From Swiss-Prot:
Its main location: membrane. One of its GO terms (cellular component) is plasma membrane. The gene is kdkA. The active site is at 175. This is 3-deoxy-D-manno-octulosonic acid kinase. It comes from Xylella fastidiosa (strain Temecula1 / ATCC 700964). InterPro entries: KDO_kinase, Kinase-like_dom_sf.
Amino acid sequence: MVAFDANEILTPFCEGHREGAILFDCQRMRQVEYGLFVPAWWGERAHPISEGGRGSAWFVEASFGNAVLRQYRRGGMIAMLNRDRYFWCGGHRTRSVLEFRLMRELISRGLPVPTPLAACYVRHGVQYRAAILMERLEGVSSLAMCVRGNSKEIHWEQIGRMISRFHREGLDHADLNAHNILLDQAGQCWLIDFDRGALRIPATKWREHNLARLLRSLLKIRGERSVDAVYRDFERLCRAYDLAWGRGC
């Protein structure tokens, strides 16, 4: 359960045939409108993000700072029939609102997460579409980019300690992969993409599931690197994870 935050404002809107709402951080944004969640509204200030995802994210240049716009898209076979609509179960249960509030809770616990700025949903009868706007982290690269670039400066131990911190706080990340771990040149790490994530009582099963998913991701993007090399790096990560977990940090 994520606690109520007095700095959140929920603003309903009706624009033509569109009805929905925008949840935003009133300390970071003064005004909001539906156009903020439409790439075309930004014009030349929106730049598609090619890495990871499903062609559903853009860097945007805003008056309130550089940001990332992400629209929620389905994956797998179901995307062939339904690309971006989800069943309506109430505004507070939309994926954008849940992720926005989860990210704010993680930040309140001191975890390295980009700041969520606003979340939007648009209802279409018994279905809805959603999008989220968040702070852009500058000077970072994804772990996937570092691996593909054969970087010698990947701080595997730091990544392991970071994941341990999130797990210690009970975060079950639904898609822990190399695209969702960001690194800077100093070795600082961040975790992104908390769609379908949840706070749980720390348990071995889901923690191991998260780590196994990350390993599969690293094997998938290994390129010309040997499988043994991937496992050696992952073992470094896991040793640091286990040590941090044992110390309770």
